[in-house]
């Protein structure tokens, strides 16, 4: 099912996506960018209270991973966001089309395993 992965480009030069931090000419491959958005949904109603200049890696590490401290953001707000994430995660069940098994859903698993602890990995995936 993943024997094609060694041929998959992990970056590209155009389109939408997140810039590669060490080389702004490149964009991170979109499947890597689009498979953990549901984590963001858990805090979207609160993030508007955070000044944009403080939304950085340390902020997301504090909220999603419980690591470090997010400077410039009220600790109680960070804790509230962390509690929201912990309440809604892990995803109990993700349903998608069978045509997405070999790409989107595979990256969905890969990225959750790479970023989050095992207690936040998806619990179930269904295809139709």
Where do the model's predicted regions map?
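Structured secondary-structure scaffolds
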Residues: 1-128
